[in-house]
């Protein structure tokens, strides 16, 4: 079983495990899933076939989170859209499909990214999202669990300074026993650190510290969905923008470059090769290029090419097939990007640095896609949220176990 770090409340609500096989026909499009012996097979559920409602009528679905909102042990998911209301909704599994509930019924213009933790320390998970290039806001929403007839109260974390906040991460990065929030602020060209106030319900916006800045035109973005301890010193580290940042004390962090060419990418981190430091994966999310994984050889980061991807704006490391070895999950956005040729890839690892490439989906774009146990059966499913390809829409690929036979992918 995967050695899982705990979530932001100290629980392991994001599971990793086992797996099935299927060919599914959807209206107007036939989707086939690959077939390598030993790969996981998937069955598709979709808003197109009535398995869940669409988020709203807008066509720019930006952000996506997977977390257990109602504490029932099944991962729920959150989707944000930036052109219409409701701007933020969440989905709960009902045994056959997913019901939609509203988090924010106003237009908020959320950017890609976001994260979650128990901000108000009441035992449930609250969510954090940043505004896109149209504004300078970062917000948090108070989870009303267990009474979802009550509204999610929205409060400011940031409402001044530079615009655009593409990606946030939450973790105890200074090992003080309290989690911190870290956010890229692209138009300010800064990486911001926020300590959660003692009374976050009456405090806001929160004070912030600039822990890194840059002067070049190239933006920085990306964080792993699960933070890791890169240098094995017992502290979680901040990873993103082709770099990792080591805590030196107080609010001081040291920049360490993994690959300067991967500044504008999505990334993941995890133990792809057993023993030693965790590895890092970078995928060009808002452009085309080579997705790579990086391992520390004792002196420097050694790069290994996975493949050329077209706007690979989904990137995670998890044990998808439940064999005890970490796998790599990367998906192409579709629009902009490869359009109807968009693919979602999985590289199944053996724990020794060897990978078998597999295509989980071909024909539907995925943006900010996530892995989680979305039907409560104990394995990892795929949340396929597109940005603007065939939107508005949401798809879920349910993990059906390991294939026994192989067939050709079409």
Language-model features: locations:
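N-terminal secretory signal peptides that target proteins for export/translocation
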Residues: 1-18
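Local alpha-helix boundary/kink/capping signal
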Residues: 11, 33-34
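Sequence-pattern detector for short linear motifs
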Residues: 11, 20-21, 47, 388
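Bacterial N-terminal signal peptides
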Residues: 22-32
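Beta-propeller-forming repeat regions
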Residues: 37-410
């Amino acid at each position: 079983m995967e050695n899982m770090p705990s979530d932001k409340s100290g629980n392991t609500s994001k599971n990793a495990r086992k797996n099935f096989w299927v060919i599914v026909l959807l209206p107007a499009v036939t989707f086939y899933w690959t077939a390598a012996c030993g790969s996981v097979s998937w069955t598709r559920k979709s808003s197109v076939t009535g398995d869940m409602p669409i988020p709203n009528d807008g066509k720019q679905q930006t952000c996506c989170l997977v977390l257990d909102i109602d504490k029932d042990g099944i991962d729920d998911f959150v989707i944000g859209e930036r052109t219409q209301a409701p701007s933020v909704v969440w989905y709960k599994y009902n045994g056959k499909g997913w019901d939609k509930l509203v988090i924010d019924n106003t237009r908020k213009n959320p950017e890609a990214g976001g994260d979650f933790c128990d901000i108000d320390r009441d035992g449930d998970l609250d969510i954090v999202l940043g505004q896109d290039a149209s504004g300078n806001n970062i917000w948090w929403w108070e989870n009303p669990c267990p009474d979802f007839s009550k509204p999610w109260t929205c409060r400011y974390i940031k409402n001044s300074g530079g615009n655009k906040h593409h990606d946030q991460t939450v973790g105890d990065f200074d090992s003080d026993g309290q989690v911190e929030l870290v956010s890229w602020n692209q138009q300010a060209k800064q990486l911001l650190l926020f300590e959660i106030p003692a009374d976050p319900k009456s405090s806001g916006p929160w004070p912030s510290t600039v822990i890194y800045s840059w002067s070049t035109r190239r933006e920085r973005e990306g964080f792993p969905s699960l933070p890791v301890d890169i240098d094995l010193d017992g502290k979680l580290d901040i990873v993103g923008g082709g770099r990792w940042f080591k805590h030196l004390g107080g609010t001081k962090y040291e920049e360490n470059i993994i690959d300067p060419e991967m500044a504008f990418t999505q990334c993941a981190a995890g133990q792809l090769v057993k023993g030693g430091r965790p590895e890092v994966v970078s995928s060009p999310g808002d452009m085309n290029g080579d997705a790579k994984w990086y391992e520390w050889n004792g002196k420097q980061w050694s790069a290994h090419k996975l493949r050329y991807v077209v706007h690979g704006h989904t990137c995670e490391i998890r044990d998808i097939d439940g064999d005890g070895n970490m796998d790599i999950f990367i998906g192409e956005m579709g629009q902009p990007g490869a359009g109807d040729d968009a693919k979602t890839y999985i590289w199944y690892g053996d724990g020794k640095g060897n990978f078998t490439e597999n295509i989980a989906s071909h024909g539907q774009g995925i943006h900010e896609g996530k892995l989680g146990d979305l039907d409560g059966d104990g394995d990892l499913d795929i949340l396929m949220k597109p940005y603007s390809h065939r939107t508005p829409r949401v798809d879920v690929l349910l993990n059906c176990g390991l294939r026994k036979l192989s067939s050709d992918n079409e």
